From Swiss-Prot:
Heterotrimer of A, B and C subunits. InterPro entries: Asn/Gln-tRNA_amidoTrfase_suB/E (IPR017959), Asn/Gln-tRNA_Trfase_suB/E_cat (IPR006075), Asn/Gln_amidotransferase (IPR018027), Asn/Gln_tRNA_amidoTrase-B-like (IPR003789), GatB (IPR004413), GatB_C_1 (IPR042114), GatB_Yqey_C_2 (IPR023168), Gln-tRNA_amidoTrfase_suB_CS (IPR017958). The keyword Flavoprotein does not apply. The lineage of its organism: Bacteria, Bacillati, Chloroflexota, Chloroflexia, Chloroflexales. Transmembrane segments: none annotated. Its EC number is 6.3.5.-. This is Aspartyl/glutamyl-tRNA(Asn/Gln) amidotransferase subunit B. It catalyses: L-glutamyl-tRNA(Gln) + L-glutamine + ATP + H2O = L-glutaminyl-tRNA(Gln) + L-glutamate + ADP + phosphate + H(+); L-aspartyl-tRNA(Asn) + L-glutamine + ATP + H2O = L-asparaginyl-tRNA(Asn) + L-glutamate + ADP + phosphate + 2 H(+).
Length: 487
């Protein structure tokens, strides 16, 4: 029997603000000593009154616009009531009936081609504290994270496979980091995912029971957790066992999902409007201001790179994966064009040597770009195009410029990387190679045309790649002919 899989994701993304969602405490909790970025509001003390963070709301609205959502003019903050040790007030300020952003969609590469994943909502809420488990079986609570601004991005159940879920999660992360609303750091918990999945026999119209997998913090784990859970549910259905709506956790060590609790329903949280925060009313003018903040998004820029710069779809995709790289490429193209260097030539350096050196050094593109000025790329290519240096020397000059942050032209001059052209120096090297390889020379004279390639390689090796290969071949042929005539 065939089975249909239905998946929806809830992405929890911390909003990049200096202060928390409803108080003035610092939202930068990563390296702070436990419970030092706290106050009566985020500790949930009686009588403490919250104040919404304007910038957090602006960035959440910006996110909604980037995800093709409609921004609600009236927003209500609600209390989501439940008890857990990391929730000091006994409720979480969130949104229920009146979220900030509704509808929307994200386009991904689906299993059968381009596919739109529809969104239900994007709403704002506050993060919880963090439990720290000790070796003796106890648990401690750090409330520095409590109250940090958070967005929940909820998709409709449009995802059909674990692979699509991974691509959707990756696409969302790309957009959030691109527009500057989230760090994209999943290891620290700044971006995490809850996955809802149900399985039903093919032909059955009614969805199967929904199982939620909580707090997944990597693309690989999303795919693996869903693949396991789908297989678990199919095995249960084949055995005639019911699937119970529940919450499970992903155990990365065993590669399995683990039962945590029976799944709650919305009614269990007893949502009601936050009495200390009146409804937020957003005007059309305010929404237009947020729309004006929106940068060119990755998909639009990728298409423009193909059409304007003549890049392949692959190169355009690579160069729009991160905004830092994409902006750097455009700066490099603008500088290179003044030297007659083509955008494709700039792209080749970035997707080749630049990325190789980033991987080798472990640097971020933003850090490397501060040293490797964008105009250096066109400078290297111009020297290569004008025959001043060979491809080998160009790579050496590029790497030196990357590591040292100095002009490639200066490096070429200092290291003597300029091409060794026709002349006495090249002739002397050619004669040395001919004298040192009598067997190869004899093969060449017997008609083995490929033998000269070996001789060319030896000359290039002796010049450290600085000679022009065409000039080397011409010098070799002339010298071999001269020696032949002298015999």
């Amino acid at each position: 029997m065939d089975y249909l899989v239905t998946i929806g994701l809830e992405i929890h993304a911390q909003i990049l603000t200096r202060s928390k969602m409803f108080c003035g405490c610092s939202a930068d909790y990563a390296d702070a000593p436990p419970n030092t970025h706290v106050c009566p509001v985020c500790m949930g003390l009686p009588g403490a009154l919250p104040t919404p963070n304007r910038r957090a709301i602006e960035l959440a609205a910006l996110t909604g616009l980037a995800l093709n959502c409609r921004i609600s003019h009236t927003n209500v903050i609600s209390r989501k009531n439940y008890f857990y040790a990391d929730l000091p007030s006994g409720y979480q300020r969130s949104q229920y009936d009146d979220p900030l952003c509704v509808d929307g969609w994200v386009e991904i590469e689906g299993d059968s081609g381009p596919k739109r994943i529809r969104l239900t909502r994007v709403h704002i809420e506050e993060d919880t504290g963090k439990l720290i488990h000790t070796n003796d079986g106890g648990s401690l609570v750090d409330f520095n994270r409590a109250g940090v601004p958070l967005m929940e991005i909820v998709s409709k159940p449009d995802i059909s496979s674990p692979e699509e879920a991974r691509r959707y999660f990756q696409k969302l992360r790309q957009i959030l980091v691109w527009i500057g609303v989230n760090s994209g750091d999943m290891e620290s918990g700044a971006l995490r995912c809850d996955a809802n999945v149900s399985v039903r026999p093919a032909g059955q119209q009614e969805y199967g029971a929904k199982v939620e997998i909580k707090n997944i913090n990597s693309f690989r784990f999303v795919e693996r957790a869903l693949a396991y859970e789908i297989e678990r549910q199919i095995r249960a259905l084949k055995a005639g066992e019911p699937i119970v709506q529940s919450t499970r956790g992903w155990d990365e060590v065993s590669g399995t999902t683990v039962a945590q609790r029976t799944k709650e329903f919305a009614e269990d949280y007893r949502y009601f409007p936050e009495p200390d925060i009146p409804p937020l009313h957003l005007t059309d003018a305010w929404i237009d201001e947020r729309r004006a903040e929106l940068p060119e998004l990755p998909d639009a820029r990728r298409i423009r790179f193909i059409e304007e710069y003549g890049l392949t779809a692959y190169d355009a995709g690579v160069l729009t994966d991160e905004r830092t790289v994409s902006d750097y490429y455009e700066q490099a193209v603008a500088a290179a064009r003044t030297r007659g260097v083509m955008p494709k030539e700039v792209a080749n350096w970035l997707t080749g040597e630049f990325f190789r050196l980033l991987k080798e050094t472990g640097e971020s593109p933003a850090h490397a770009a501060q040293r490797m000025r964008p105009e250096y790329i066109g400078e290297v290519q111009e020297l290569l195009n004008n025959g001043v240096i060979t491809r080998t020397s160009a790579k050496e000059a590029f790497e030196a410029a990357f590591r040292e942050g100095r002009s490639p032209a200066v490096i070429v001059a200092e290291r003597g990387l300029a091409v060794i052209g026709a002349g006495d120096a090249l002739t002397d090297l050619v004669r040395q190679v001919i004298a040192g390889n009598p067997k190869v020379v004899e093969e060449y004279r017997r008609g083995k045309a490929t033998a000269i390639k070996y001789l060319i390689g030896q000359v290039m090796k002796a010049t450290r790649g600085q000679a022009n290969p065409q000039a080397v071949q011409q010098a070799l042929e002339q010298e071999l002919a001269r020696e032949q005539a002298a015999c």
